[in-house]
Amino acid sequence: MSLIRPALVLFILLTLLTGGVYPLLTTSLGQWWFNSQANGSLIRLNGEVRGSALIGQNFTAAGYFQGRPSATAETTDNPMASGGSNLAASNPALDKAVSERVQALRAANPDADPRVPVELVTTSASGLDNNLTPAAALWQVPRVAQARQLSVEQVTQLVNQATQTPLLSFLGQPVVNILQLNMALDALKDK
């Protein structure tokens, strides 16, 4: 009987601490210090949510930059269905899918270098990658410029402006957020 009371008190105390105080504290700090990130890194235009800086979208029109292909192609609007294809590099299905993507990209981008950047034909581990390297974005510039009736220099300048350098300039590689780049293209059209 003498052990039950301290065990019960400790159980109640730890339940309140780990089930109440700790979650409230971490949620409050997250909302205070990292409000945008804690709420999904949403990108808004005129008060309307256009997407998240963290979730890739499927852009198919010629006047938009395209992101990485998704292994969740059937459910591109559902980020809960994220995941890679889990196909091995030696799998014929992966080889066929990559070959088809290369052919489609070459057909859609006839003025681009025939060497297609690898991230435009392979899926990411999450299937929802939102960024490309500047090289992959620049590869698409001739198609986007032609479709939008802009100069290659204008579109290249937008890509360069949208390029984000990694933290401390050495932790990672520069990337271009495709949603933000496409929104910048739309803003250029509206001017």
From Swiss-Prot:
Keyword Zinc: no
GO molecular function: ATP binding; P-type potassium transmembrane transporter activity
Alphabetical UniProt keywords: ATP-binding, Cell inner membrane, Cell membrane, Ion transport, Membrane, Nucleotide-binding, Potassium, Potassium transport, Transmembrane, Transmembrane helix, Transport
GO CC terms: plasma membrane
Residues annotated as transmembrane: 6-26
Record text on subunit structure and interactions: The system is composed of three essential subunits: KdpA, KdpB and KdpC.
PANTHER family named in the record: POTASSIUM-TRANSPORTING ATPASE C CHAIN, POTASSIUM-TRANSPORTING ATPASE KDPC SUBUNIT
HAMAP family: KdpC (MF_00276)
General function of this protein: Part of the high-affinity ATP-driven potassium transport (or Kdp) system, which catalyzes the hydrolysis of ATP coupled with the electrogenic transport of potassium into the cytoplasm. This subunit acts as a catalytic chaperone that increases the ATP-binding affinity of the ATP-hydrolyzing subunit KdpB by the formation of a transient KdpB/KdpC/ATP ternary complex.
Name this polypeptide is given: Potassium-transporting ATPase KdpC subunit
Organism field: Klebsiella pneumoniae subsp. pneumoniae (strain ATCC 700721 / MGH 78578)
Gene symbol of the encoding locus: kdpC
